[in-house]
C-alpha cells in the first residue's frame, strides 16, 4: 500500500520550497482541471497549465476567482490526458511565490448520441475537447452580463457590428453571417439581464448551418438564476455545466428546444425548481429540459433535482419520420415524471439512473419508438408506460379502465423496446406476453389480474440488444408499431453502453456540474421516493441561493438518504464480490468534508502544508477519503462514529477508528456518515476496483 509522508502528498500537491502559496484540493475532471488554494496576501494569481505537449500555458484571468480567503481556478478546454497546474502569486505586478500540483488526470466527455450523427460536433469545441480554431471566448458575470461586447458579422459583405450584452450578441448571430465559433462562459451566480426575451436567453441562429455556439458555466458554481434558455432555428449548439434554478420566464422551461433545431447537445447541467406556473402540475416550475420539432439531439449527464416534469419530447410534429434523440447517463434524482414523455420521436434512452420517482419513468404515445437500454430503476413507481394500455389502464385494480385510469396521456400509444434494464424496490411493470410480472414489487400472475399481456403491456422486452420488434406487436390504441430505428445502420450511431449498475455509478459521479456542483441536497428516500409534492426546505434553499462562498452549501439535518445507524440496520456480507466496474478515480484523488458541512461536498482546500496530523488543526477537513489507498481519515476531536452505507441504504461498515480501511468493500458508490458531538457529516465516495 502506498504511504503518504505529508498531507499535501496525499492531496496530490507539491509546494515549491520556500513558497507561500498553500494549495488545497486539485483534480482533473471532464476536459477540465481545477485547483484551490489559500490566500497568501498576493494581489492576484497567475495560473499556468502544462501537459499533453503544452508547457506553461497561461490561463485566462477570468478563470481565477476569489471566494473569501480561498482562491480557485477551473481550466476548461483540455484534451484528455495528464496535466499540472502552477499557481503563481502576483504582488505589485510582479510574480512571486508559486506552487504546482502533482499530475492531474483529465478525462474526455462522452460524445455519444444523435447530436454527433453525420460527423457533426456541436458547439465551440472540437471532438478532442479543445476550442475550435479561431473561437471567441466571452466571460459573463453578474457585473458584465449587460456590458459584454463582440464585433459580429451582420451582412453578406462581412460588415461588423459591435453588439452589446450576451443576448444582443446572440441577436446579431441570428442574421446568419457570423461563422466564428462562439463560447459564452458564465462565471458565478448570474441573475436576469436587461436584454432577455420574455425572461429567457434565446439562441436563434437563423437556421445557419455554419454557426457553432457553446453556452457553458465555469467550475462548480456557474448558475443561471431566475431565467431560462430557449433554443430555436439553431444548429450546432452546446449547453453545459450550468445550474439552472428559479426560472420565472414566460415560457417557464429551464431549457427548451422549441423548433427547427438540429445537432444540439445539452449535458452536465443541474436542473432545479423553477417558479410555480398557473397549472396545477407546474408547482415545481414547468419543463426542466423539453424538446419539440427538433432532431439529432443528445441530452446526457444531466442531474434533475426533484423536478416535476423533466423531459417533454414532442408536441405537434405529426410524423414519426426523421425525429431522433438520445438520453444517456442522466440522473433523475427524485424527479416525478417525463423521463422522457414521448410523442412521435425515435428516442434512445440508455444508461440513465431513475432514483426514487413518484409518478413514472419513460412514457410512449402517438406512435413513438422508444428504446430503453441498460437503465437503472430504484423505486420508480412505473418505470415504463405506454399510453392507454398495460399499467396505464390497470394501475388501480384488475379491470381495464381507460376512463378512470389512463391519466398518463389519453393519447394513442407508441411502443417501448426494453433491454438490460435493472429494477429494484416498489414498482409495477408488465412486459409483453408475460405470464407473471411485478405489481408494487410483488410477483403477480397475469391470470389473477385478468390481463392479456399481448395486448396490455408496458414494453416489449428482448434478450438481445439487436432483436427487432415484430410488426405484429401493436399499441392497443392506435395500432402503432415500433420502427426498429435502433437496428437500422443507416440511422443508428456507434456507442458503448455500460451495464445498468456501472451506469448508475458513473451517473452519480459525473452527472451535473464540475464535482457535482456547489449546491448540495440529500433526499430522504423514505419520504421523497413516493412524494411528488414540493420539498419546501429545498425550495426555500434555492430561493435563498445567492452564490457560492467557496465552501459547501449545507444540507438541513432532517434530510438523509441513510438507513438508521442502530445495530438492527442490515449489514452486507463483505466477502461477496462483484464483476461490475466503475469509472476509476485518479490515483491522487481525494474527497473531503470540513467540520462545518453536513452533506456530500465539493472538496475544500486544506491549510496544512507540512507533515502534521490531520486532527491537529480544525482548519483541516474533518473527514477525507484517499482513493489511491482506499481509506478514510478522520480529523475530529473527541469521540465519533463512522457508518459506511450503500446507495440502497444498507450499512456495510461501522467504525470508531481514525483510519478506516475500505479495501474490503466491493467497487461502487457509498455514502459515509461521520457522527460526532451531536453533529453529522456526510460524504459520497466512489470506491474503485482494485
What are the functions of these language-model segments?
Residues 211-221, 235-246, 261-277, 287-288, ...:
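Right-handed parallel beta-helix
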Residues 19-42, 95-108:
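Pro/Thr/Ser/Gly-rich low-complexity, intrinsically disordered linker/stalk tracts
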Residues 163-180, 195-214, 223-240, 246-261:
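Extracellular beta-strand-rich solenoid/capping regions of secreted or surface-exposed proteins
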Residues 574-576, 584-586, 590-690:
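C-terminal outer-membrane/trafficking sorting elements
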Residues 196-203, 225-229, 248-258, 278-291, ...:
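Extracellular beta-strand/beta-solenoid scaffold signature
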Residues 42-63:
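Extracellular low-complexity, O-glycosylation-prone stalks/linkers
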Amino acid at each position: 500500500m502506498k504511504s503518504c509522508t505529508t498531507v499535501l502528498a496525499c492531496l496530490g500537491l507539491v509546494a515549491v520550497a520556500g513558497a507561500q502559496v498553500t494549495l488545497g484540493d486539485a483534480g482533473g475532471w471532464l476536459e477540465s482541471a481545477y485547483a484551490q488554494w489559500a490566500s497568501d496576501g498576493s494581489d492576484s494569481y497567475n495560473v499556468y497549465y502544462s501537459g499533453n505537449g503544452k508547457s506553461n500555458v497561461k490561463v485566462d484571468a477570468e478563470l481565477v476567482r476569489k471566494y473569501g480567503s480561498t482562491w480557485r481556478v477551473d481550466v476548461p478546454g483540455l484534451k484528455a490526458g495528464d496535466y499540472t497546474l502552477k499557481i503563481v502569486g502576483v504582488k505589485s505586478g510582479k510574480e512571486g511565490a508559486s506552487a504546482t500540483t502533482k499530475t492531474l488526470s483529465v478525462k474526455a466527455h462522452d460524445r455519444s448520441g444523435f447530436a454527433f450523427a453525420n460527423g457533426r460536433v456541436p458547439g465551440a469545441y472540437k471532438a478532442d475537447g479543445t476550442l475550435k480554431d479561431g473561437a471567441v471566448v466571452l466571460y459573463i458575470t453578474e457585473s458584465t452580463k449587460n456590458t459584454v461586447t463582440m464585433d459580429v458579422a451582420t451582412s453578406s459583405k462581412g460588415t461588423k457590428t459591435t453588439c452589446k450584452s450576451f443576448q444582443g450578441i446572440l441577436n446579431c448571430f441570428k442574421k446568419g453571417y457570423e461563422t466564428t465559433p462562439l463560447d459564452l462562459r458564465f462565471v458565478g451566480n448570474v441573475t436576469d439581464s436587461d436584454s432577455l426575451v420574455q425572461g429567457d436567453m434565446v439562441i436563434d441562429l437563423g437556421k445557419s448551418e455554419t454557426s457553432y455556439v457553446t453556452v457553458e458555466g465555469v467550475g462548480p458554481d456557474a448558475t443561471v438564476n431566475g431565467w431560462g434558455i430557449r433554443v430555436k432555428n439553431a444548429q450546432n449548439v452546446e449547453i453545459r455545466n450550468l445550474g439552472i434554478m428559479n426560472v420565472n420566464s414566460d415560457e417557464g422551461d429551464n431549457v427548451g428546444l422549441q423548433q427547427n433545431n438540429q445537432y444540439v447537445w445539452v449535458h452536465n447541467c443541474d436542473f432545479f425548481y423553477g417558479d410555480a406556473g398557473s397549472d396545477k402540475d407546474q408547482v415545481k416550475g414547468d419543463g426542466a429540459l423539453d424538446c419539440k420539432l427538433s432532431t439529432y439531439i443528445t441530452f446526457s449527464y444531466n442531474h434533475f433535482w426533484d423536478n416535476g416534469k423533466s423531459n417533454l419530447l414532442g408536441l405537434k410534429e405529426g410524423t414519426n419520420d426523421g425525429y431522433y434523440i438520445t438520453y444517456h447517463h442522466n440522473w433523475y434524482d427524485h424527479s416525478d415524471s417525463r423521463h422522457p414523455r414521448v410523442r412521435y420521436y425515435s428516442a434512445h434512452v440508455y444508461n440513465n439512473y431513475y432514483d426514487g420517482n413518484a409518478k413514472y419513468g419513460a412514457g410512449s404515445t402517438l406512435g413513438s419508438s422508444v428504446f430503453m437500454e441498460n437503465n437503472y430503476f430504484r423505486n420508480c413507481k412505473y418505470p415504463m408506460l405506454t399510453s392507454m394500455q398495460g399499467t396505464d389502464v390497470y394501475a388501480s385494480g384488475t379491470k381495464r379502465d381507460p376512463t378512470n385510469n389512463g391519466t398518463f396521456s389519453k393519447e394513442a400509444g407508441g411502443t417501448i423496446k426494453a433491454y438490460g434494464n435493472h429494477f429494484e424496490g416498489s414498482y409495477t411493470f408488465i412486459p409483453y406476453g408475460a405470464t407473471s410480472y411485478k405489481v408494487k414489487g410483488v410477483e403477480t400472475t397475469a391470470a389473477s389480474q385478468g390481463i392479456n399481456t399481448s395486448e396490455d403491456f408496458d414494453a416489449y422486452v428482448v434478450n438481445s440488444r439487436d432483436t427487432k420488434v415484430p410488426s405484429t406487436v401493436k399499441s392497443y390504441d392506435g395500432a402503432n408499431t415500433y420502427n426498429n430505428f435502433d437496428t437500422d445502420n443507416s440511422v443508428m450511431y456507434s456507442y458503448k453502453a455500460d451495464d445498468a449498475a456501472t451506469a448508475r455509478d458513473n451517473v452519480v459521479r459525473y452527472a451535473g456540474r464540475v464535482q457535482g456542483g456547489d449546491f448540495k441536497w440529500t433526499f430522504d428516500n423514505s419520504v421523497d421516493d413516493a412524494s411528488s409534492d414540493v420539498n419546501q426546505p429545498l425550495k426555500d434553499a434555492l430561493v435563498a441561493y445567492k452564490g457560492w462562498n467557496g465552501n459547501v452549501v449545507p444540507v438541513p439535518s432532517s434530510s438523509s438518504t441513510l438507513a438508521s445507524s442502530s445495530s438492527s440496520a442490515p449489514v452486507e456480507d463483505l466477502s461477496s464480490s462483484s464483476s461490475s466496474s466503475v469509472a476509476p478515480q485518479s490515483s491522487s484523488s481525494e474527497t473531503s468534508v470540513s467540520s462545518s458541512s453536513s452533506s456530500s461536498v465539493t472538496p475544500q482546500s486544506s491549510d496544512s502544508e507540512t507533515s502534521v496530523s490531520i486532527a491537529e488543526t480544525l482548519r483541516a477537513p474533518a473527514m477525507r477519503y484517499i482513493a489511491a489507498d482506499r481509506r478514510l481519515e478522520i480529523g475530529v476531536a473527541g469521540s465519533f462514529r463512522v457508518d459506511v452505507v450503500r446507495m440502497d441504504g444498507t450499512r456495510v461498515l461501522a467504525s470508531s477508528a481514525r483510519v478506516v480501511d475500505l479495501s474490503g468493500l466491493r467497487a461502487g458508490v457509498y455514502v459515509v456518515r461521520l457522527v460526532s458531538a451531536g453533529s453529522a457529516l456526510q460524504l459520497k465516495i466512489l470506491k474503485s476496483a482494485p
